[in-house]
């Protein structure tokens, strides 16, 4: 999961940079989020990320322009800002979930040798 946290952090960093919001949104999404599959994300953010992905890919490109560029070009400044807020909100939620993860112990009885003896329940 920390890979996704890192990707969203990088996207938020781009969004916080200089330049027009539409160009920052394009760069943040294309460089950091485009390769993320919503099925890899926590359940609590799957739908929000899917919605963002839909917004970023909803326009058919023209003249060699990419889908993301075309979609953001058709957005108003307010819509682009809302998408940027969605990225920040997703980053916050993914970070919160990642920080709250507990260590997962192996369930396979063959792997009990890697579990400290005081944690193994005797049968």
What are these regions (language model features)?
Residues 70-123:
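Amphipathic alpha-helical binding modules
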Residues 6, 31, 39, 51, ...:
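Acidic-enriched, low-complexity/disordered segments with a strong bias for Aspartate over Glutamate
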Residues 19-67:
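Amphipathic alpha-helical interaction modules
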Residues 1-31, 84-88:
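Short terminal alpha-helical segments
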């Amino acid at each position: 999961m920390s890979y996704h946290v890192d990707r969203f952090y990088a996207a938020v960093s781009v969004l916080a940079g200089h330049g027009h919001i539409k160009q920052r949104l394009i760069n943040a999404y294309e460089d950091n989020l485009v390769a993320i599959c919503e099925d890899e994300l926590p359940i609590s953010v799957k739908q929000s990320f899917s919605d963002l992905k839909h917004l970023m890919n909803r326009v058919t490109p023209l003249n060699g322009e990419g889908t993301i560029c075309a979609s953001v070009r058709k957005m108003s400044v307010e819509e682009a800002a809302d998408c940027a807020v969605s990225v920040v909100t997703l980053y916050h939620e993914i970070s919160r979930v990642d920080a709250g993860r507990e260590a997962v112990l192996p369930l396979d009885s063959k792997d009990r040798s890697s579990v400290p003896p005081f944690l193994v329940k005797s049968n």
